[in-house]
Amino acid sequence: MLLLWQSRIMPGSEANIYITMTEYLLLLIGTVLVNNFVLVKFLGLCPFMGVSKKLETAIGMGLATTFVLTLASVCAYLVESYVLRPLGIEYLRTMSFILVIAVVVQFTEMVVHKTSPTLYRLLGIFLPLITTNCAVLGVALLNINENHNFIQSIIYGFGAAVGFSLVLILFASMRERIHVADVPAPFKGASIAMITAGLMSLAFMGFTGLVKL
C-alpha cells in the first residue's frame, strides 16, 4: 500500500527508483535478520563455533568473511552469466564456484597476511577453511536459484556476510562472559555453547514476518 501511494504522488521514474531501492533494502534486511544464514539456514556452523571463543578473533573472521562472501557472490554471478550459461555447461556450476571461492579466499589470505600479521596468526587454520565454508558456496548457489540480478547478488552476498558477522560477534561476546561465569560442570564447553546458540536462534525468530521475500 505504501509503495502504491508513493507511486501515485511521484513521477514515473522517481517512483520506479524508490520502489527499486525499497526492494533492495528489504532484501538486505531479510538476508541479515529474517533469513540469517547461521541461525535460520544453519550454514557456516563450523567457523561459528570454532572462531567465537574470543571477540577479537570473531571480529577479524567476520571482516574476512564479509569480504570473501561479497566478492565471491559477484564473481560467481559473472562466471554463471558469461561462462557457464553461454557455453551450456551449467552442470559444472558447483565445481566452478568452488574454484572461484578458492581464488577469492587465497587473495583474502594474502591481503590479511600483509596488512595484519597478528590477525593472520589469530585466525590460523580458519582463514583458509573459508574455502570449505558451506555458507560461501550456499550464497553463490542461492543467488542463481533465486534468479538475482547483478546488484541483487551483491546485496544478497553482503547481507549474508553481515548476518554471519553479526551473530558471530554477538556469540563471541556472550561466550567471553560465560567463560568467567559460574557454569555447572556438566554444561561447560560445547554444551553451554550450543544452548547459547539455540537461545540466539529463538531470539532471531522474533524477526519472522518482518520482511516477506
From Swiss-Prot:
Residues 46-58, 108-121, 175-190 are cytoplasmic. Its EC number is 7.-.-.-. NCBIfam families: PRK05151.1 (NF003481), rnfA (TIGR01943). It is found in: Cell inner membrane. This is Ion-translocating oxidoreductase complex subunit A. The complex is composed of six subunits: RnfA, RnfB, RnfC, RnfD, RnfE and RnfG. It comes from Vibrio cholerae serotype O1 (strain ATCC 39541 / Classical Ogawa 395 / O395). It is a multi-pass membrane protein. Belongs to the NqrDE/RnfAE family. One of its GO terms (cellular component) is plasma membrane. The chain crosses the membrane at residues 25-45, 59-79, 87-107, 122-142, 154-174, 191-211. Part of a membrane-bound complex that couples electron transfer with translocation of ions across the membrane. InterPro entries: Ion_transpt_RnfA/RsxA (IPR011293), NqrDE/RnfAE (IPR003667), NqrDE/RnfAE_oxidrdctase (IPR050133). It comes from the Bacteria. It holds the Pfam family Rnf-Nqr. Keywords: Cell inner membrane, Cell membrane, Electron transport, Membrane, Translocase, Transmembrane, Transmembrane helix, Transport. The gene is rnfA. It is an enzyme of class 7 (translocase). The lineage of its organism: Bacteria, Pseudomonadati, Pseudomonadota, Gammaproteobacteria, Vibrionales. Residues 1-24, 80-86, 143-153, 212-213 are periplasmic. One of its GO terms (biological process) is electron transport chain.
